[in-house]
Amino acid sequence: MRLLHTADWQIGRQYGRFAPEDALALAEARFSAVERLARLATEQAVAAVLVAGDVFDAQTVSDRTVRRLFNAMQGFSGPWILIPGNHDAALAESVWHRAKRLGAIPTHVEVLLEPGVYAFPQSGIAVLAAPLTQRQTSADLTAWFDNAESPEGLLRLGLAHGSVQGQLADDIDSPNPIAAERAARARLDYLALGDWHGLKRIDERTWYSGTPEQERFKNNGAGQALIVDFEQSGQPPRVTAHQVGEFQWRQWQETLGVDSDIDRLIERLEALPAPAVLALNLAGDTDLAGHQRLIQALAEAEARHRSVQYDLSALRLQPTDADVAALDADGYLGDVIDELRAQQSLHDDEASRDALVLLAGLLRERLPQAASSAEESALGMGTLEREDNA
């Protein structure tokens, strides 16, 4: 017997911190992740797909989004078994009721809106479902599992959405609690959980699958789904993680001091597998030449990856004498550069740093033009001399 366990699709999620083009691509990636889940389920010949809540990111997603989600599930013709989570709770009027009215839910998709034991004899499983009927509760909605009866001969599976107490980093006074020993107490063959967006093993029969498409800068194993194999009756299942997500999210903190630091950062950027979503915070010191190299490398990274966001506000610009000489700035402009250097050095003034960068860029643009004008002038002088000698 083989099952696929997934959760926290968050269909309809918005990405307000990103540029519109990137935000749209990240939202679309969540539909693509569901399509890949369907392919994985078909390739692995699973008996059913268990989806442990938060299928939708909000109750207010559009009708089109609802229809698109169920269309994305068509790649697997076996049973999909879903429960609502805190984002799409089974309220008196919910996104699930709207989906039913739209006729959007295919016949092979089962949405379990009420707690209970649901038998799927063709798949060989009985699902003890604990859907959320409100966004938050202080009660353990899986407590009734302990005394619930299920049909003989079927695997006894729990399906729930919440926070296993004492196991998660963010679970202090968290809503929707679940007892850590629930699988053992309730004699479950497996407890499929959602709500924690990373991959996490609670015990040999209790797992969080995490979200199939990463959406946060956390190194917690997001972007995967679980294939669960039951090989011997009464024995714990064999659980295998499969990569599903498209984008890897990375958050880097870098402190620069010497040229080799910039070299290493550029090498790291070039080695980052594409496509990625990168947030980069830089601190330390760099000269003008190093700053120019850094900006060029970031521009190239932006072209390779889905999103590159960087914060240079803590990076101090320390132009060297060689930097200033290369700009060929004298007179008033030279005095301005000296003043900006002093302001930026003494007061770590962000406005002075930005002005230095802008002025340096303008002067660099002027240098090729000046060289070109001098060359044209020299060519013209040579022509006049030839004409005079003719």
Listing of model-derived features with the role each one plays in the protein:
Residues A45-V46, L154, R187, A274-A276, ...:
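Short loop/turn motifs at secondary-structure junctions
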